[in-house]
Curated annotation (Swiss-Prot):
This is UPF0246 protein NMCC_0856. Belongs to the UPF0246 family. One of its GO terms (biological process) is response to hydroperoxide. The lineage of its organism: Bacteria, Pseudomonadati, Pseudomonadota, Betaproteobacteria, Neisseriales. HAMAP family: UPF0246 (MF_00652). GO terms for cellular component: cytosol. It comes from Neisseria meningitidis serogroup C (strain 053442). PANTHER family: PEROXIDE STRESS RESISTANCE PROTEIN YAAA, PEROXIDE STRESS RESPONSE PROTEIN YAAA. InterPro entries: YaaA (IPR005583). It comes from the Bacteria. It holds the Pfam family H2O2_YaaD.
Length: 259
């Protein structure tokens, strides 16, 4: 069983990683092709392409200029500790023990606009390139065309090598669109997290993102290898709702009074 997650725009570059173990991204040669093109963009072009402020555009122009291989612990950081958004706050990998971190390495993959598909302990350098960015490149008009089936093929290889036939999708639609589900050789499960508000259950973005990370933490803390055991997920008041679920979409609900 493997989980896939989205990356985060917010990065933690300052705090040292709590573990020394690391791996290298499998698709770094592809990343280098993208970065060569990104380096050609002036800050104003980055601002327009990514719809960000001049300050953020300048920061990322500097990141692009400084991006260089090979990656080492001195010039890069493991992805699971670099990403710092809602999902990763829910996962809180910094407080997992080494055995649980290794569980993440063996069961979790992170989708990325620049790096394609990452293991949690893959070293990365800071960047900003969301998968949905309309970045024209050598292979097409956007990143979905750049990556084509590369991410899907690597996922299939990863699943086959592990003898696994289940992929749990905890990524956003923007990122999971980079996976060709028609060519994916795995059973696909998509957990959905709903919160009660004014008597009705709905997906609330902040809670849903955070809970995706919480589910991965739950799996690591309980060393889960059987997908069915995920139905026991109960962190922060969520409960599996069998009636609202089907074979591929598993719905977890939390009532208002539990928050």
């Amino acid at each position: 069983m493997f989980f896939v997650l989205s990356p985060a725009k917010n990065l933690n570059e300052k705090d040292p990683a709590p573990v020394s173990e690391f791996t290298q991204p499998d698709l770094l040669a592809e990343s280098d092709i993208l970065m060569q093109q990104l380096r050609e963009l002036a800050p104003q072009q980055i601002a327009e392409l990514m719809h960000v402020s001049d300050k953020i555009a300048l920061l990322n122009a500097q990141r692009n200029a400084e991006w260089n291989t090979p990656f080492t612990p001195e010039n890069a950081k493991q992805a699971v500790f670099m990403f710092n958004g809602d999902v990763y706050e829910g996962m809180d990998a910094n407080t997992l023990d080494i055995g649980q971190i290794r569980y993440l390495q063996n069961h979790v993959r992170l989708l990325s606009g620049l790096y394609g598909l990452l293991r949690p302990l893959d070293l990365i350098q800071p960047y900003r390139l969301e998968m949905g960015t309309a970045f024209a490149n050598l292979r097409g008009k956007n990143l979905y065309e750049f990556w084509g089936d590369i991410i899907t093929n690597l996922l299939n290889d990863t699943l086959a090598q592990a003898g696994s036939n289940t992929l749990v999708n905890l990524a956003s639609q923007e990122y999971f669109k980079s996976v060709n589900t028609k060519k994916l050789r795995a059973r696909l499960i998509t957990p959905i997290f709903k919160d009660e508000k004014n008597g009705k259950y709905k997906i609330i973005s902040f809670y849903a993102k955070r809970t995706r990370g919480l589910m991965v933490r739950y799996a690591a803390e309980h060393n889960i290898t059987d997908p069915e055991m995920l139905k026991n997920f109960n962190y922060e008041g969520y409960v599996f709702n069998d009636a609202a679920s089907n074979e591929s979409e598993w719905v977890f609900m939390r009532s208002e009074q539990i928050k």
